Amino acid sequence: MNLQELHTKIQLQIDIKIEVNTMDSIFKQLFQYGYHDTEITSIDCEGLEVKLNFDKGIYLLDENGNETILSKPMQVILKISSYSDSFEESFEIKEYGKKIKYLEYITLKKYLQKESFGISMCYYSNFDSCILFDGGFSKRNIMFSIDGVNEIIIQEL
């Protein structure tokens, strides 16, 4: 490999890494899969990283964007912008019904230890790079959002 080929290869690797961190690519990465009627079975957070586990999988999409079959168990890793001191600053969790009640992350984690979070809808906003999951547990309607997402990794468990 000559110097020019090596330079081109390195530049391509740099371009790919930059593309991974754009808001548009977060949207594309997130919505390569379908989340409606899937379940978050556990959540783990450390530092500026949020890991959502889908033990029953997430939906694979066909060429028209329609949900087809469930994947193998998957993990969605969300990396949060460094302007937050911790992942908790990027979370907003609301239980809603007749009234709206704000919840702490630890409460959501406790609920997940008892049962899975069923997802009705998943939204993404370019404003502050925010992902919102709407759904809940058997007797609780919950929306939780994570803002400042600057990278997403979706992988098999």
What residue ranges belong to the model's regions?
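Surface-exposed, interaction-prone regions used to assemble/regulate multi-protein complexes
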Residues: 2-157
